[in-house]
Amino acid sequence: MTPISQRISQKSPKLRETKQIQMTTTDKSAGIVTDSEAGPETSLLLNPHEGSTKKAPSDSYHFAYIIYFTLGVGFLLPWNAFITAVDYFSYLYPSTAVDRIFAVIYMLVALVCLFVIVVFYAHKSLASFRINLGLLLFVIALLVVPVLDLVYVKGQVGLYAGFDVTSAAVALSGLGDALMQGGLIGVAGEMPERYMQAVVAGTAGSGVLVSLLRILTKAVYPQDPDGLRKSANLYFAVGIVVMVICAVFYNVAHKLPVIKFHEERKNEELIREKSEEKGSLTGLAWRTTLWDIVTKVKSHGFGIVLLYMVTLSIFPGYITEDVHSELLTDWYPILLIAAYNVFDLVGKCLTAVFMLEDEKIAVGGSIARLLFYPLFWGCLHGPMFLRTEIPVTILTCLLGLTNGYLTSVLMILAPKSVPLRHSETAGIVTVMFLVVGLASGSVIAWFWVI
């Protein structure tokens, strides 16, 4: 075992954000200090070589938090735009299972690219380069649909060459997701937990934004081909604007004192590692270290896979296809999806108030969510009172709330279970687990009906 591997196997570095009054504590059971205990920016850097203590500057006006939240909104918005416009694509290409094909393309490309990044490039490429490249690919992919619609499709049905180009744009978005999400989660993992919480909450914010747009377009535009076309173009236009905002925000973030502090902290760790190891990790040494990182976060990853397997096998397929309401008619699935997204956001924001610091309990919660299967089954086949709008709405809200909270907990804890210098890689590995969960849930949704 290499020296790096030995250090990863030793004491978990959960003390990296200890309160000032406990900064000399070395008790391994101290755990991660929450923002409510130590304040959002009281992280301390203990440099054994200098014998000095550096205190992180405050996040003035919460600019850094807002930036990371916005970036979280950004990397899921392209996928949300494609999948929300599926009604228009289904109209254009009636003999194609558009939503299923898009899901396979997007997730397969994202998963393969994440694997390549984590194995070959994560330890020797800059996260800033990957994030900016991902944003550029997102903008290009989002431009494809409205430009294609303007110059070629023009609302005509059956031009399947247009579907091929659109599918290529979905694949490009999957690549952009792997680059941006992997890099962003990795960078957030190197910082105090409030920034990972901001990113994760941003992903839920993306869902809420798209739900609001869907409600707006349904209320404003007629549900005919022209209305569907205008709605789709609006989704992609909003997506492009948000991508530009994300690009500006991310490249401005490095000028904030709090971001500079944590970047310098990471650089000091890297310099110390190279001096102790007499060089950078390459080849077999890196693969051994990577395996140790995977071992450290495997329980978190299992919980995340299970979370999204359950969620995606029920939502949105079951909610949009299997339940009906005479009262709410075609508004019913739209409102259920909005309810899920709102409570997913609430759950992901709750970790800013109360942070569960034991991953075993969080994984247990992920396992307990298997109970949603018989509960939703009861809403279809059980007693009549379970088949009404109220039980389905309550279960949908609980599905979103538990998904949001447990996702946030596991995503925050995973990078903190390894040394700081490996937090970025741990974050990327965790994203791989997340994509596996998404893919598993989508497959179950296709072949198994509640």
From Swiss-Prot:
Keyword Transmembrane helix: yes
Location(s), subcellular: Vacuole membrane
Tree of life domain: Eukaryota
UniProt entry tagged with the keyword Glycoprotein: no
GO cellular component labels: mitochondrion; plant-type vacuole; vacuolar membrane
Gene Ontology MF: a single term: nucleoside transmembrane transporter activity
Membrane topology (UniProt): Multi-pass membrane protein
Tissue distribution: In young seedlings, expressed in root elongation zone, root cortex, root-hair, at the transition to the shoot and cotyledons. Expressed in hydathodes of fully developed leaves and pollen.
Entry-linked InterPro entries: ENT1/ENT2 (IPR034764), Eqnu_transpt (IPR002259), MFS_trans_sf (IPR036259)
Miscellaneous field: Plants over-expressing ENT1 have decreased leaf content of adenosine and show growth deficiencies. Plants silencing ENT1 have increased leaf content of adenosine and decreased rate of pollen germination.
The protein, known as: Equilibrative nucleotide transporter 1
Species, as recorded: Arabidopsis thaliana
